[in-house]
Every structure is written in C-alpha cells, then in structure tokens.
C-alpha cells in the first residue's frame, strides 16, 4: 500500500450538505475533515474502535478531543461537485496532533480544514502520549514528501 491510498480520498457534494444558496453549509467542511481522517486511518489499517471509544465496551482508554479547528474557503463548493480530499497529519508534540484536509476541485484548492486533537486518558482526562499505532500512521503519512506525490 502506498501513502496516496490513505491520504487521497473522494467526496461527492450532496443536496443535504448545502444551504439555501446552493453551496455547502460551513460546518460540513469540518465534518468532512473529521470523516476523512477517520476513513484514512481505517484504510491504513487502524480499526476505528481502537481510536474512537465505545463506552459500552470500554475498549479504548484514550480519547482525542478537538482542541482547535478551522475552516477556510477559497471558492464555492456546490451540489454535485466531486472533490479530492488530501489528508496531511502531523505531530505537534507528544500529546497533540493536527490533521489538515485539503479539498481540491478540478485541480484547484477550494477549501481547507484544520483540526487539532489532544490525546487524553479517558478516566483522569490527563494528557498522555499519542498511541503508537496513531503515531505510525502520522509518520507513514510523512506529509513533507508524500503530499507532493499525492
């Protein structure tokens, strides 16, 4: 498997994604950004339940709350648009990581989402190190070289 398999995804804009002006409602960009990194880690081989806790079975002792997010729009995104979504994760420090999502339409960047997550112990809510499997995904994604290839 090559990095582009989990770093480049597709998103089709649907009617329900848009507002009355016929362009995507702003909050959907952040939703799509989060969904894209979820899909990316699954394609990479990390089961979703290993990252996102199911409190009924308590499989995970780690949570990743969003501590900062941002959405930037460069051009309208409309119903029916087919977007390429490029994922660019990177580690900020031992407990913080950022996932950037670049939304490309016809070769042009039309939007960008940035989400920063903090790695916390589920019970104490203390900061803890990013787990190994997630760290491996970030390292394997190697944004500085692989994003150019994508």
UniProtKB/Swiss-Prot annotation:
Cross-referenced Pfam families: 4HBT_2
Listed SUPFAM superfamilies: Thioesterase/thiol ester dehydrase-isomerase
Membrane listed as a keyword: no
Pathway per the UniProt entry: Cofactor biosynthesis; phylloquinone biosynthesis; Quinol/quinone metabolism; 1,4-dihydroxy-2-naphthoate biosynthesis; 1,4-dihydroxy-2-naphthoate from chorismate: step 7/7
Active-site residues, as the UniProt record annotates them: 19
Claim: Metal-binding is one of the keywords in the record: no
Entry's Gene Ontology BP terms: phylloquinone biosynthetic process
Enzyme Commission number: 3.1.2.28
Keyword annotations of the record: Hydrolase
Descriptive protein name: 1,4-dihydroxy-2-naphthoyl-CoA hydrolase
Source species: Prochlorococcus marinus (strain MIT 9301)
Lineage: Bacteria, Bacillati, Cyanobacteriota, Cyanophyceae, Synechococcales
């Amino acid at each position: 498997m090559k990095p582009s398999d989990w770093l480049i995804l597709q998103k089709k804009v649907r009617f329900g994604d848009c507002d009355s002006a016929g362009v995507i409602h702003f909050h959907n960009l952040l939703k799509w950004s989060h969904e894209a990194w979820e899909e990316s880690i699954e394609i990479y081989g990390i089961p979703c339940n290993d990252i996102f806790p199911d409190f009924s079975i308590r499989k995970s002792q780690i949570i990743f709350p969003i501590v900062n997010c941002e959405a930037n729009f460069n051009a309208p995104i409309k119903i029916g648009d087919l977007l390429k979504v490029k994922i660019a994760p990177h580690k900020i420090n031992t407990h913080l990581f950022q996932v950037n999502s670049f939304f490309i339409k016809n070769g042009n960047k039309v939007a960008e989402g940035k989400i920063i997550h903090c790695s916390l112990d589920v019970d104490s809510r203390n900061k803890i190190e990013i787990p190994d499997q997630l760290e491996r995904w970030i390292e394997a994604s190697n944004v500085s070289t692989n994003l150019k290839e994508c």
